[in-house]
Amino acid sequence: MCAARMAAAAQSVYSFSAHPLAGGEPVNLGSLRGKVLLIENVASLUGTTVRDYTQMNELQERLGPRALVVLGFPCNQFGHQENAKNEEILNSLKYVRPGGGFEPNFMLFQKCEVNGAKASPLFAFLREALPPPSDDPTALMTDPKFITWCPVCRNDVSWSFEKFLVGPDGVPVRRYSRRFPTIDIEPDIQALLSKGSGGA
């Protein structure tokens, strides 16, 4: 089934799976039922790589015990800022950017496309469920030379490090632009975690 048809048929992220960056069996997102998910398309050479990767680690470390799961999906569609091979990405993060021995403590998956005909079915679904980022409803890729995919849609991801927050029922709740710092999503995450635990 093509990505668009899979996305149209889905009611939650639990319909999708993804291949871990380290290899092995695909992770069925249904196995994360009951967790709050923060999903980001990431890149090793973006201007916000250091900020967002370190903040993703921070949120996973502090809120993971309360049922937050951070998921990163490397993508090379924006300025070719993830041009490493899958097997090179962890070393790039460790030694280049963020560097200093950095290791992600959250799940990273194999490179995928998030826009266009070859978009990951998960991202096609997320874009349909949450068309504009909540903090920047007019966010668009505005420089034609950077548009490397087809077809171009109004709900396309506009750059690396867009964020999608998914509730414990697997339904997307909110989308944030690349300009929105990952750490600033914490109040929304805390609200979902409290709701999921009955307000405890």
UniProtKB/Swiss-Prot annotation:
Disulfide bond annotation, renumbered to this chain: none
N6-acetyllysine modification, residue list: 85, 111, 118, 145
Catalyzed chemical reaction(s): 2 glutathione + H2O2 = glutathione disulfide + 2 H2O; a hydroperoxy polyunsaturated fatty acid + 2 glutathione = a hydroxy polyunsaturated fatty acid + glutathione disulfide + H2O; tert-butyl hydroperoxide + 2 glutathione = tert-butanol + glutathione disulfide + H2O; cumene hydroperoxide + 2 glutathione = 2-phenylpropan-2-ol + glutathione disulfide + H2O
PTM field: During periods of oxidative stress, Sec-46 may react with a superoxide radical, irreversibly lose hydroselenide and be converted to dehydroalanine.
Family annotation (Gene3D superfamilies): Glutaredoxin (3.40.30.10)
Segment forming the signal sequence: none
Modification type N6-succinyllysine: residues: 85, 111, 145
Pfam family, one: GSHPx
Record PROSITE patterns: GLUTATHIONE_PEROXID_1, GLUTATHIONE_PEROXID_2, GLUTATHIONE_PEROXID_3
Main location class: cytoplasm
A GO biological-process term: arachidonate metabolic process
Active site, renumbered: 46
EC number(s) stated in the UniProt entry for this protein: 1.11.1.9, 1.11.1.12
Residue stretches spanning the membrane: none
Cellular localization per UniProt: Cytoplasm; Mitochondrion
Entry-annotated residues carrying Phosphoserine: 31, 194
Subunit text: Homotetramer. Interacts with MIEN1.
Family per record: Belongs to the glutathione peroxidase family.
Functional description taken from the UniProt entry: Catalyzes the reduction of hydroperoxides in a glutathione-dependent manner thus regulating cellular redox homeostasis. Can reduce small soluble hydroperoxides such as H2O2, cumene hydroperoxide and tert-butyl hydroperoxide, as well as several fatty acid-derived hydroperoxides. In platelets catalyzes the reduction of 12-hydroperoxyeicosatetraenoic acid, the primary product of the arachidonate 12-lipoxygenase pathway.
PANTHER family linked: GLUTATHIONE PEROXIDASE, GLUTATHIONE PEROXIDASE 1
Protein's recorded name: Glutathione peroxidase 1
